[in-house]
C-alpha cells in the first residue's frame, strides 16, 4: 500500500474512495504514472488485465496492421507505435485491402484542420481518391454521397447526418488520443452531441482502427468495455525510423542570454564587458550551442513553445543568415515543402500533427520549452518536436525555462524521473511522498467527475478527464513537465541525457540540475523581457470610438465614462484566452454583486452567464488590428456558479468595487483564513477544476517529509514550514490571481479600514479594540478611544493586504457605477426574460425587497 502520512497525523487525505490494487498501481506510482498514461506499459498491462484481448509486439521494422480480409481479424484494432514508425503508411495499405467495393464507407476522424488536409492529400497521392473532407460540403449537414468516405475534424462530427453516421463500415481514429483530447478544447462547441455521436460510432461500427503514438491502457480498457475483450486486437510497435531512433536529446542547464544580448546589441562603443567566450561557458548554453552551429554553417530547425521567444531567437539567427523562416499563430503557415530553402526554420505548436518535413536538410534541432499554466502541454510539445523527420547529425538540444512554473509552496511536484529510478533509485521518502501526492490527485479528479453532471452524461469526456487534468495541472511544476517530456521522448526510442551527465543519473544529480535550471531561468527572465519584441505601436482610440462592435461591447460590459485609450488597453489584454477568461469571471462577479439573487438562484445566474459569457467581443491583436473573437462556451456552468457564489460573499465582506480599484478594506492573514474556512476544501477543488491548479492541502504540507521532497524537486532552496495561515494566504492569492486576474498586494495601512487613521470613526475604533480584546470601558470620547488605539499600535503591526484590480478591471460596470437606474438597461432586458418562478419567493410571492 502507498504511504498515507505520519503516524501522528493520521491519513492526510481524509475519508476517500478506496483505490483498488490495480488502479492503485496505475495511478499512484509517481515513477511510472507518465509511462502508463502514454502507453509505455501496454505490452505488460493488456495480458494481465484483459487476457482475452490479443496483443502483437512489432520490434524489427515499420508497423503493420492485421490482414483486413482475414476471417480471424477482430473488429477493433488499437495501434500504439512511436512517431516515425510508419503508422499512416500502414493505414493507407490497410484501407486499400479493406475497401472491397465502391459502396464501402469509411469515416476518418481527425484532431486538427491541418491534419485533415494533409491526410486527404496523402490519401489522394496513394490512390484513395474517393475521400473528401468536410471543407468541400456546401451544406451544413452531410448526409449522402460523396461523404460516405469522409475525413472530418472531431469538432464537426455533429455535421455528419444520421443516414451516413449509422452506416459507416470503417471508423478510423488517427491520432486518437489527441482527437479525444479535443473534447476538452475551448473550440468544442457541441460537446454533448459530439460525445454521444462518437460513442455510438465506437459501439456500432463494424471495423475500427484507433492509432496513436501515446495510445494507452485507458483507451484499450474503454474499447474492451464497449465491444468486449474478444473483439479487440492491440498492436504495440517498438520500432522507430532512424530519424528518431538515432536522435540524441540533450537537456541544457543554461539559456545564455549574455550571448543573445551581445549579438543583438546595436553597433557602437561597448557598454560593458564582453560575455565569457570560453568553450565551457558557451557549451552549456542554448545560445552558445546555437551560435556554434550557425557559425559552422549548419541548417537548424528551432521549436519554441512561446511566440515571444520565437521572435527573439529569429532576431538572433538573422545575425548569421538572412534565410530564416518564422512560423507561429500570427504568421501564414505556408507550404512545409519550402522549408528546404531556409537555413533556419523557427516554429511553435502551430506546426503539429499532420504537418511534417521529410527531406534530409536540417543538421540539428533546438527546442525552448516554457511550462505555463495555460500551455502548451508537454504532449503538444512532443508532437511538435517530431515534425522534422530526419536530422543529419541527429542532435536535439532542449532548454526548459522554469520561470513560467508556479513558485508558491502549495504547488508540489508529484512525479519522479524514471531514469533516476532505474539507475540510482529514489530514496524511499521521495517515492512515499510523491506516490501519496499522486493518490491525492486521483482523488481530486474523481471528485470532479462525481460533482459534474456533464461528466455523468458524457461517457468519453468523463473517461479521459484524468489525463486532461494531469497534462494541465503538471504544467505548474518544472520537474513534472520535464519528467513527462523525458518519458515521451524515451518512449519514442530517443536517447535522452542531461548536460554534464551520462546515461546514469542519481537523485542528487537530478535535483541539482533542476536547481541550476530554475535559477538560470529566473536570471534570464529580466533579459528576455528587455529584448522581447514589443507590440507595434498603433493609434487606435479613434477607431475604437467609431466602431459599432466596440460601442456595443462598452454598453454591455463597461462604465459609460471609460476613455477610448482605456478601451484600447483592455482590448489588447483580451487578445489572449487567459485575458478573456479572467475578464468574463470578473464581469460575472460584478454582476453577482449588482444582482445578489444570482447567488441564490441557478436560473438567474445562468441568464447572467449567458448574457456575459457568450457571443463575441472585440480584441486588438499583436499587429494592431481590431478583431472579433468568439467566447468559448464553458462546458459545465455549475462550478462557475459555485465559485461566483463563494467569491461574491468574500467580495462583499472586503467591500469590493472594481471601479474603485479593488477591496475597500484591508485584511490580514487571519482574516483570509476566516474568509476561506467555511468552504476551504471546495475552494481547492474549484481552483483545480476551473484554474487547473493542483494545490497540495495544508495537512500534507505540514509533514516534514513532504516539505523536504517538495524543496528538492522544486529546484528551490529549503523553505520553512507552511503554516495554516500561510497556506490560506497562498490559496486566496491563487483564487483571485489565477481566476480573476486580481493581485493581492501588501497594504501600508497599520489599521484595517479604507480611510486614514485620523479619520476613523468612534464606532470603527471600538470595533478594532473589541476585535483585539482591548478593554476600553474607561474611554468615553473619540479622543480617549483614539489614544488607547495608538497605545496598542504594536498589536496591529502584522502584515495587511489589499486586493488590487488590474488596470482594465477599473473599466467594468460595477454596483457603484450603476447607481443610475438606467445604467444597466441591457442586463435588465436579459433578466426580464426569466419567468417569475425563477426569482426567490417569500410566502408564495416574489420577495421584491431583495431584488
Curated annotation (Swiss-Prot):
Functions as a docking protein to recruit essential components of the viral replication machinery to viral DNA origins. In the presence of the major DNA-binding protein, opens dsDNA leading to a conformational change in the origin that facilitates DNA unwinding and subsequent replication. ATP binds at residues 81-88. Pfam families: Herpes_ori_bp. Residues 1-21 are annotated as: Disordered. Homodimer. Interacts with the major DNA-binding protein ICP8. Interacts with the helicase/primase component UL8 and the polymerase accessory protein UL42. Disulfide bonds: none annotated. Belongs to the herpesviridae OriBP family. It comes from Human herpesvirus 1 (strain 17). One of its GO terms (biological process) is bidirectional double-stranded viral DNA replication. Its main location: host cell. GO terms for molecular function: ATP binding; DNA replication origin binding. Residues 68-233 form the Helicase ATP-binding domain. Signal peptide: none annotated. This is Replication origin-binding protein. Keywords: ATP-binding, DNA replication, DNA-binding, Host nucleus, Nucleotide-binding. It comes from the Viruses. GO terms for cellular component: host cell nucleus. It is found in: Host nucleus.
Amino acid at each position: 500500500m502507498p504511504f498515507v502520512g505520519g503516524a501522528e497525523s493520521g491519513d492526510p487525505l481524509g475519508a476517500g474512495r478506496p483505490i483498488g490494487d490495480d488502479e492503485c498501481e496505475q495511478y499512484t506510482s509517481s515513477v511510472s504514472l507518465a509511462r502508463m498514461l502514454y502507453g509505455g506499459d501496454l505490452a505488460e498491462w493488456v495480458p494481465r488485465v484483459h487476457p482475452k484481448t490479443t496483443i502483437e509486439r512489432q520490434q524489427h521494422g515499420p508497423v503493420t496492421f492485421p490482414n483486413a480480409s482475414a476471417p480471424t481479424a477482430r473488429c477493433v484494432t488499437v495501434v500504439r507505435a512511436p512517431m516515425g514508425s510508419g503508422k499512416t503508411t500502414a493505414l493507407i495499405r490497410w484501407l486499400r485491402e479493406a475497401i472491397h467495393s465502391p459502396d464501402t464507407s469509411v469515416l476518418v476522424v481527425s484532431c486538427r484542420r491541418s491534419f485533415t488536409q494533409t491526410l486527404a492529400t496523402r490519401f489522394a497521392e496513394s490512390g484513395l481518391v474517393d475521400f473528401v473532407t468536410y471543407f468541400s460540403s456546401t451544406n451544413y449537414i452531410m448526409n449522402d454521397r460523396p461523404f460516405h468516405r469522409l475525413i472530418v475534424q472531431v469538432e464537426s462530427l455533429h455535421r455528419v447526418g444520421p443516414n451516413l453516421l449509422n452506416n459507416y463500415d470503417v471508423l478510423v481514429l488517427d491520432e486518437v488520443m489527441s482527437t479525444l483530447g479535443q473534447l476538452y478544447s475551448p473550440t468544442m462547441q457541441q460537446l454533448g452531441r459530439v460525445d454521444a455521436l462518437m460513442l455510438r460510432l465506437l459501439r456500432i461500427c463494424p471495423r475500427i482502427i484507433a492509432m496513436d503514438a501515446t495510445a494507452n491502457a485507458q483507451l484499450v480498457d474503454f474499447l474492451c468495455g464497449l465491444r468486449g475483450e474478444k473483439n479487440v486486437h492491440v498492436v504495440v510497435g517498438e520500432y522507430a525510423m532512424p530519424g528518431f531512433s538515432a536522435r540524441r536529446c540533450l537537456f541544457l542547464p543554461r539559456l545564455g542570454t549574455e550571448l543573445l544580448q551581445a549579438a543583438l546589441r546595436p553597433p557602437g562603443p561597448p557598454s560593458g564587458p564582453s560575455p565569457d567566450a570560453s568553450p565551457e561557458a558557451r557549451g552549456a548554453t542554448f545560445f552558445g550551442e546555437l551560435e556554434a552551429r550557425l557559425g559552422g554553417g549548419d541548417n537548424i530547425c528551432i521549436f519554441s513553445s512561446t511566440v515571444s521567444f520565437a521572435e527573439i531567437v529569429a532576431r538572433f539567427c538573422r545575425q548569421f543568415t538572412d534565410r530564416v523562416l518564422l512560423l507561429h499563430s500570427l504568421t501564414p503557415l505556408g507550404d512545409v515543402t519550402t522549408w528546404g530553402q531556409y537555413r533556419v526554420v523557427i516554429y511553435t505548436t502551430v506546426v503539429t500533427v499532420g504537418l511534417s518535413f521529410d527531406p534530409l536538410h536540417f543538421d540539428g534541432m533546438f527546442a525552448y520549452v516554457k511550462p505555463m499554466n495555460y500551455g502548451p502541454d508537454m504532449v503538444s510539445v512532443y508532437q511538435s518536436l517530431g515534425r522534422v523527420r530526419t536530422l543529419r547529425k541527429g542532435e536535439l538540444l532542449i532548454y526548459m525555462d522554469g520561470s513560467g512554473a508556479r513558485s508558491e509552496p502549495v504547488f508540489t511536484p508529484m512525479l519522479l524521473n524514471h531514469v533516476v529510478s532505474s539507475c540510482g533509485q529514489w530514496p524511499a521518502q521521495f517515492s512515499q511522498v510523491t506516490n501519496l501526492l499522486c493518490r491525492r490527485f486521483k482523488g481530486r479528479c474523481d471528485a470532479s467527475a462525481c460533482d459534474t453532471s456533464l461528466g455523468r452524461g458524457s461517457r468519453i469526456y468523463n473517461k479521459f478527464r484524468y489525463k486532461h487534468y494531469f497534462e494541465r495541472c503538471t504544467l505548474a511544476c518544472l520537474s513534472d513537465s520535464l519528467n513527462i517530456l523525458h518519458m515521451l521522448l524515451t518512449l519514442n526510442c530517443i536517447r535522452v541525457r542531461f548536460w554534464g551527465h551520462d546515461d546514469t543519473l542519481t537523485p542528487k544529480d537530478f535535483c541539482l540540475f533542476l536547481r541550476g535550471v530554475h535559477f538560470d531561468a529566473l536570471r534570464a527572465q529580466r533579459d528576455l523581457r528587455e529584448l522581447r519584441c514589443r507590440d507595434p505601436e498603433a493609434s487606435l482610440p479613434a477607431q475604437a470610438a467609431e466602431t459599432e462592435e466596440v460601442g456595443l461591447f462598452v454598453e454591455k460590459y463597461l462604465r459609460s465614462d471609460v476613455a477610448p485609450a482605456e478601451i484600447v488597453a483592455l482590448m489588447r489584454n483580451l487578445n489572449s484566452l487567459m485575458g478573456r477568461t479572467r475578464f468574463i469571471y470578473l464581469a460575472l462577479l460584478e454582476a453577482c454583486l449588482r444582482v445578489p439573487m444570482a447567488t441564490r438562484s441557478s436560473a438567474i445566474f445562468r441568464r447572467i452567464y449567458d448574457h456575459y459569457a457568450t457571443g463575441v467581443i472585440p480584441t486588438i491583436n499583436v499587429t494592431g488590428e481590431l478583431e472579433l473573437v468568439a467566447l468559448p462556451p464553458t462546458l459545465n456552468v455549475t462550478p462557475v456558479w459555485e465559485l461566483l457564489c463563494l467569491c461574491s460573499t468574500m467580495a462583499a465582506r472586503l467591500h469590493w468595487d472594481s471601479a474603485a480599484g479593488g477591496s475597500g478594506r484591508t485584511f490580514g492573514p487571519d482574516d483570509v483564513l476566516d474568509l476561506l474556512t467555511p468552504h476551504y476544501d471546495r475552494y481547492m477543488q474549484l481552483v483545480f477544476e476551473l484554474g487547473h491548479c493542483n494545490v497540495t492541502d495544508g495537512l500534507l504540507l505540514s509533514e516534514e517529509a513532504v516539505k523536504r521532497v517538495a524543496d528538492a524537486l522544486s529546484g528551490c532552496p529549503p523553505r520553512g514550514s507552511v503554516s495554516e495561515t500561510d497556506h490560506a494566504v497562498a490559496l486566496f492569492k491563487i483564487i483571485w490571481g489565477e481566476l480573476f486576474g486580481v493581485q493581492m498586494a501588501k497594504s501600508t495601512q497599520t489599521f484595517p479600514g479604507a480611510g486614514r487613521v485620523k479619520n476613523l470613526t468612534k464606532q470603527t475604533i471600538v470595533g478594532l479594540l473589541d476585535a483585539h480584546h482591548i478593554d476600553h470601558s474607561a474611554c468615553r470620547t473619540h479622543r480617549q478611544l483614539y489614544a488607547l488605539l495608538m497605545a496598542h499600535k504594536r498589536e496591529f503591526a502584522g502584515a495587511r493586504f489589499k486586493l488590487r484590480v488590474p488596470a482594465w478591471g477599473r473599466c467594468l460596470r460595477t454596483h457603484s457605477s450603476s447607481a443610475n437606474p438606467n445604467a444597466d438597461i441591457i442586463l435588465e432586458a436579459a433578466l426580464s426574460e426569466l419567468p417569475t418562478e425563477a426569482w426567490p419567493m417569500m410566502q408564495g410571492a416574489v420577495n421584491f425587497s431583495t431584488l
